[in-house]
């Protein structure tokens, strides 16, 4: 089973559109992932101007559909001390460390397109990119 991070979800939706929804069955995301994916789309639209406002809205609706089909893991389900320990020892954000801790605790493969996160995560859990799923 898979745990998708925001970078993977955003890239899957941009590349595959609604076809990305097929990847959701029995898989997971963190409850904060929607906010992160929305922020990534905002960055692509408002700051980098790589997509239009209309494209960002369409992608956001697909992201919401994608997340609505995934099993969401809340912060209350993850060992907070483990997250903080990873964040401090590996110099990752608390957000990024939460993906590793959740994948570790639930024995999931972490799907991420964040190279820095993947490099650290591969010492703890199986990892894949969105191109590999």
Question: What is each PLM-predicted segment?
Answer:
Residues 1-34, 49-58:
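Short, well-structured N-terminal submotif of metal-dependent ribonuclease cores
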Residues 7, 38, 115:
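Anionic group-transfer/hydrolysis microenvironments
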Residues 12, 36, 82, 119-120:
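Phosphate- and divalent-cation-binding pockets in alpha/beta enzyme and binding domains
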Residues 39-46, 104-105:
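Short glycine/serine- and small hydrophobic-enriched flexible loop segments
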Residues 30, 34, 100-133:
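Acidic, PIN/NYN-like endoribonuclease modules and their adjacent C-terminal/linker elements
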Residues 34, 38, 56, 60, ...:
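A general structural signal for well-ordered alpha-helical segments in protein cores
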Residues 68-116:
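Active-site neighborhoods of divalent-metal-dependent phosphate/nucleic-acid chemistry enzymes
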